C-alpha cells in the first residue's frame, strides 16, 4: 500500500475561533500553533502548509500566573551598542494587547519560510469583535 500525500492546493482548510479570555497564555498559544501546523489532521505533513486558519479573540484578557505579569520581560535589540530594549508583560499588554500572544505562537512555529507563512494564518484581536464572520469560524475551547 502506498502512502498518500495531500498537496497544499488539495488541503481542506477550516476556520477556528478561540476565545482567549481567562486562559493561560501558553495553553492558548500551544493550541493555536497545533492548529496552524495541521497536526490535528491525519494528512499532516511537516514540510507543507496543511494547517487551518485561526481567529483568536479577547487576546488582551489572557493571563499569566503568579508574579509573571510583572517579572516576564520581552527583549529586542536595535543593532546599535547599548540598544537592548526591554518591556514587561503587563506594560506590553497595555501598549499592544495582541503582541504577547503573537510572540508566543510565533515561538512555537518552525523557524524559516514555513513558519513565516504559517504565522500569517492566525488573526489575533484584542476585543471580541472580528471581521471574519463570513468565514463561519468554528468555536473551540482550549
Curated annotation (Swiss-Prot):
Tagged with keyword Ribonucleoprotein: yes
Superkingdom to which the source organism belongs: Bacteria
Pfam families: Ribosomal_L13
GO biological process: negative regulation of translation; translation
Coiled coil: none
InterPro entries: Ribosomal_uL13, Ribosomal_uL13_bac-type, Ribosomal_uL13_CS, Ribosomal_uL13_sf
Record carries keyword Ribonucleoprotein: yes
A GO molecular-function annotation: structural constituent of ribosome
Cellular compartments per GO CC: ribonucleoprotein complex; ribosome
Alphabetically ordered keywords of this record: Ribonucleoprotein, Ribosomal protein
Function of the molecule: This protein is one of the early assembly proteins of the 50S ribosomal subunit, although it is not seen to bind rRNA by itself. It is important during the early stages of 50S assembly.
Similarity annotation: Belongs to the universal ribosomal protein uL13 family.
Quaternary state and interactors: Part of the 50S ribosomal subunit.
Designated name of the protein: Large ribosomal subunit protein uL13
Amino acid at each position: 500500500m502506498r502512502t498518500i500525500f495531500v498537496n497544499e492546493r488539495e488541503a481542506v482548510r477550516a476556520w477556528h475561533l478561540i476565545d482567549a479570555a481567562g486562559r493561560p497564555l501558553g495553553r492558548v498559544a500551544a493550541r493555536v500553533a497545533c492548529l496552524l501546523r495541521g497536526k490535528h489532521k491525519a494528512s499532516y505533513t511537516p514540510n507543507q502548509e496543511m494547517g487551518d486558519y485561526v481567529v483568536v479573540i479577547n487576546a488582551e484578557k489572557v493571563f499569566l500566573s503568579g508574579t509573571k505579569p510583572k517579572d516576564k520581560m520581552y527583549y529586542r535589540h536595535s543593532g546599535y551598542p547599548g540598544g537592548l530594549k526591554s518591556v514587561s508583560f503587563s506594560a506590553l499588554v497595555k501598549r499592544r494587547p495582541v503582541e504577547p500572544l503573537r510572540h508566543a505562537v510565533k515561538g512555537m512555529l518552525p523557524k524559516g519560510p514555513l513558519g513565516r507563512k504559517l504565522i500569517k494564518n492566525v488573526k489575533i484581536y484584542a476585543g471580541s469583535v472580528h471581521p471574519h464572520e463570513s468565514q463561519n469560524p468554528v468555536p473551540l475551547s482550549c
